[in-house]
Regions:
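Bacterial Sec-dependent N-terminal signal peptides
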Residues: 1-31
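Long, internal low-complexity/basic segments
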Residues: 23-34, 41, 46, 78
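Proline/glycine-enriched tight loop/beta-turn segments at coil->beta junctions
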Residues: 29-35, 248-253
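Active-site segment of extracytoplasmic enzymes that catalyze sulfate/phosphate-ester chemistry
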Residues: 38-39, 46-147, 152, 206-207
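Generic enzyme active-site microenvironment
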Residues: 40, 163
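Catalytic metal-binding/acid-base residues of hydrolase active sites
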Residues: 44-45, 100-101, 166-167, 260
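Formylglycine-dependent
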Residues: 111-159, 166-263
């Protein structure tokens, strides 16, 4: 059996964090292309870790213990001049399309189709931003059309897995569905960025008969309903299952792991 290493990367830009984790995955492949795991951590500042992203540790670095991030940095690379938008959708739209918010013009969080999420202000005019998010195909108003790097990976032989928070496009637009972006497997990804409940006891925001209590109800985790399983644990278990299945394929894999709760 050949051991295949995941390329390590540590990236903490302001409010969002992406990590490309290192691990040894045993596969039967002779393909030398790397397996990739990319973590997107929600609402995490550049000082919200014991790993300093400045020339020296700050007071806030001392408040945290994140040994795994320190290990990733030692074994990989750190990028200290990166940028992320201050809220969810713009950052995730940038990641999936490779464009910044000034170009894709998704400048606030998205949810319902053709609905701005800006707070009303009598003193300010609301800009005509792309409140329907991003898409790979034209045809939806107020939507940026771009190419997904996940689609490129898939087209070049990668098995692609999405797990967790998507938040790329509004409800009933092509961009809301991770499959649209080239993911072959989608675990819990949909249009909403928040979640109705973190708890399996509350069916992650569904009633006992399976009806969502709000647009924030987390889909696809029915097997954990009624159990004492926090949503992070449920997503982790599903990601591990998807990776174990992917190891059986004669192709490299890409896992996008986007946990729902803030870090």
């Amino acid at each position: 059996m050949n051991k295949k290493k995941l390329f390590p990367l540590a990236l903490v830009p302001l409010a969002a964090t992406s990590l490309q984790a290192q691990s040894n995955i045993q596969t039967g492949r002779t393909d030398k292309r790397p397996n990739i795991i990319l973590f997107m951590v929600d609402d995490m500042g550049w000082q919200d870790t014991s790993l300093p992203f400045w020339t020296q540790k700050t007071h806030y670095n001392e408040l945290y213990e994140t040994p795994n991030m320190e290990r990733l940095a030692r074994q990989g690379m750190m990028f200290t001049q990166a940028y992320a938008s201050s809220i969810s959708s713009p950052t995730r739209c940038s990641l999936i399309t490779g464009t910044n918010a000034a170009r894709h013009r998704v400048t606030n969080w998205t949810l319902q189709k053709n609905t701005m999420t800006d707070r009303k202000n009598k003193q300010l005019a609301v800009p005509d931003w792309n409140y329907n998010g991003v898409s790979q195909v034209p045809g939806t108003n107020n939507t940026f059309v771009g190419t997904s790097f996940v689609q490129i990976l898939k087209d070049n032989g990668y098995h692609t897995i999405h797990c967790g928070k998507a938040h790329f496009g509004s409800i009933d637009t092509p961009g809301e569905d991770p499959h649209h972006w080239g993911f072959e497997v989608n675990i819990a990804g949909h249009a909403a960025g928040g979640l109705a409940s973190y708890l399996g006891e509350e069916n992650y925001g569904h009633t006992k008969d399976g009806k969502p209590v709000s647009l924030m109800a987390v889909p696809g985790l029915e097997k954990y309903w009624g159990t004492e399983t926090f949503v992070t644990e449920a997503l982790t278990q599903e990601a591990i299952k998807a990776l174990n299945k992917a190891k059986k394929y004669n192709q490299p894999f890409y896992l996008y792991m986007a946990f729902l709760p803030p870090a």
